[in-house]
Amino acid sequence: MFSIIIIASVILLITTVVMFLASILSKKALIDREKSSPFECGFDPKSSSRLPFSLRFFLITIIFLIFDVEIALILPMIIILKYSNIMIWTITSIIFILILLIGLYHEWNQGMLNWSN
């Protein structure tokens, strides 16, 4: 039993040394400035931070976030179905989905879902 632990330790040590040597030998001498800079959604981090930002992109993001939270609220309703009255569950679900559909209709009617504007 003790010999198995020693053999596993030696294999681990050899593997670690080989990986360390491979990483040292494979490094490039010149590190590219663009490759080492952080990437943030296509924005250049080295330029001015006061660039114009698309309000439409921001609003689409907020709409997505709202509907994503609403989906997270809908999913537990299936689990609640086992423990609650079917009539109360149905009425609650219909009201919740109607509120979602009214919100979606309002966003559509206001033109927030049209990307071409």
UniProtKB/Swiss-Prot annotation:
<feature type="transmembrane region" description="Helical">
    <location>
        <begin position="4"/>
        <end position="24"/>
    </location>
</feature>
<keyword id="KW-1133">Transmembrane helix</keyword>
<keyword id="KW-1278">Translocase</keyword>
<keyword id="KW-0496">Mitochondrion</keyword>
<dbReference type="GO" id="GO:0008137">
    <property type="term" value="F:NADH dehydrogenase (ubiquinone) activity"/>
</dbReference>
<dbReference type="Pfam" id="PF00507">
    <property type="entry name" value="Oxidored_q4"/>
</dbReference>
<feature type="transmembrane region" description="Helical">
    <location>
        <begin position="86"/>
        <end position="106"/>
    </location>
</feature>
<dbReference type="GO" id="GO:0045271">
    <property type="term" value="C:respiratory chain complex I"/>
</dbReference>
<comment type="function">
    <text>Core subunit of the mitochondrial membrane respiratory chain NADH dehydrogenase (Complex I) that is believed to belong to the minimal assembly required for catalysis. Complex I functions in the transfer of electrons from NADH to the respiratory chain. The immediate electron acceptor for the enzyme is believed to be ubiquinone.</text>
</comment>
<keyword id="KW-0520">NAD</keyword>
<dbReference type="InterPro" id="IPR000440">
    <property type="entry name" value="NADH_UbQ/plastoQ_OxRdtase_su3"/>
</dbReference>
<keyword id="KW-0830">Ubiquinone</keyword>
<keyword id="KW-0812">Transmembrane</keyword>
<dbReference type="InterPro" id="IPR038430">
    <property type="entry name" value="NDAH_ubi_oxred_su3_sf"/>
</dbReference>
<keyword id="KW-0679">Respiratory chain</keyword>
<protein>
    <recommendedName>
        <fullName>NADH-ubiquinone oxidoreductase chain 3</fullName>
        <ecNumber>7.1.1.2</ecNumber>
    </recommendedName>
</protein>
<comment type="similarity">
    <text>Belongs to the complex I subunit 3 family.</text>
</comment>
<keyword id="KW-0472">Membrane</keyword>
<dbReference type="GO" id="GO:0031966">
    <property type="term" value="C:mitochondrial membrane"/>
</dbReference>
<keyword id="KW-0249">Electron transport</keyword>
<feature type="transmembrane region" description="Helical">
    <location>
        <begin position="60"/>
        <end position="80"/>
    </location>
</feature>
<keyword id="KW-0813">Transport</keyword>
